[in-house]
Amino acid sequence: MSDTQHQVNVRVDTRYLPEQSAPEQNRFAFAYTVTIENRGEVSAQLLSRHWIITDGDGRTQEVRGAGVVGEQPLIAPGAQHTYTSGTVLATRVGSMRGSYQMLGSDGVAFDAAIPVFRLAVPGALH
């Protein structure tokens, strides 16, 4: 059975930040811009986030917290919310994935999956 009430799509674009990186110190900074689109039939508020960040050596870090960049946006049906944040890795490549914990205006809590996306210094991958 498909839940048409609660459908949230997440897209992510990334970029390497050379001006904030120090490769000689194994510090590689990345920005990511997330677009959260509410394709459901009810408004949905983003309450919290859960990230799983993995570097190129397989080291994993989990991050949990309220909202995103200090906000807990309420996203109407058909609307979207976009924000930019960042992370620092100790390797030239890595990945992130996770989920947002959402609350529909109908009182139903649900998770919106954040598909895995790659972080990579340009030219690091063939």
Swiss-Prot record:
The ApaG domain, residue ranges: 2-126
Biological process (GO), any one: error-free translesion synthesis
Tree of life domain: Bacteria
Protein name in UniProt: Protein ApaG
Gene: apaG
